[in-house]
Amino acid sequence: MIWRLNVRLSCLLACWLPLAAHAVDVEPGKDPVPSVMWAFYHKQFLAEAPFVFDERVKLLTPPFAEDARQVPLEIDARAFKGHVLKILAWAELNPLPKIVDFQPKAGVLPWLSLRIRIEQATPLRAAVLTDDGLWHVGSTLIDAAGGGCTAPSVVRTQPGWEEHIGEVLGGRYPRGEFSRVRVQVAHPMDNGMVSGIPEFYLNHAQLRGQDGQVLAELELFPAVSENPNLAFDIDAPGPTRLVLRDNSGNEFDAAIP
């Protein structure tokens, strides 16, 4: 029994030590967008785990946000296809910084497009966790006049908006070896920063394949713009379904042929 236990411990150590050595030896490199907040968010969101600043994680966004309530953001980690466990994105100087926790699975590429709100000029980060336990951090800067997080809702000014909550518009479009699913979801995405209006936002989404398997999971946060626009790249065959839930427990379901 003692011999078997020693063998098991030896096997565990043999598997763990290379990863531990990798974690200790990693050199993060220079922050491409130096920020006084990086150390805080490294601890807050990544639990001070090993990381590298990596230009292979691409964040595409306009240099200046003309409308700070609707800022297009594209996160591209396809350089790590097949090895991505999750992608975390945040805006460092937002009052509500976290944007999305995206977990692509088999059949979905590590690429995501959405629209966000920013309150002021800020560094944007996307941290990609790969299956070797290392975070790869992509960065960019965006300038803005500001006010995107505290601006009143446009959705709530439209007559009968409550009747359309959860409606999904969009489709699936071929793009060579994969297809792109692009949707817009009717929802005010209230972030609780406008007087008299509590938080009311979509906080969870699943993309499912034709046999019900989960292709991707997303945790959404109030930094996502109202009437969220989401896009995914899929290389799985057949139709898909988008299943959504908001923080009030409402659930929505849409078929995407």
Q: Model-found features: residue ranges?
A:
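Low-complexity, Pro/Ser/Thr- and charge-rich linker/hinge segments at domain boundaries
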Residues: 28-34, 145-170, 176-178
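N-terminal edge beta-strand
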Residues: 41-66, 158-174
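Structural beta-strand segments of beta-rich domains
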Residues: 69-73, 177-181
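Aromatic sugar-binding surface patches on proteins
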Residues: 105-112, 222-233
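Surface-exposed, short loops/turns at beta-strand junctions within beta-sandwich domains
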Residues: 115-121, 233-238
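Short acidic/polar inter-strand loop motif in beta-rich domains
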Residues: 131-137, 246-254
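Short beta-strand edge segments in extracellular beta-sheet folds
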Residues: 141-147, 257
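Short amphipathic, basic-aromatic surface patches that mediate peripheral association
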Residues: 184-196
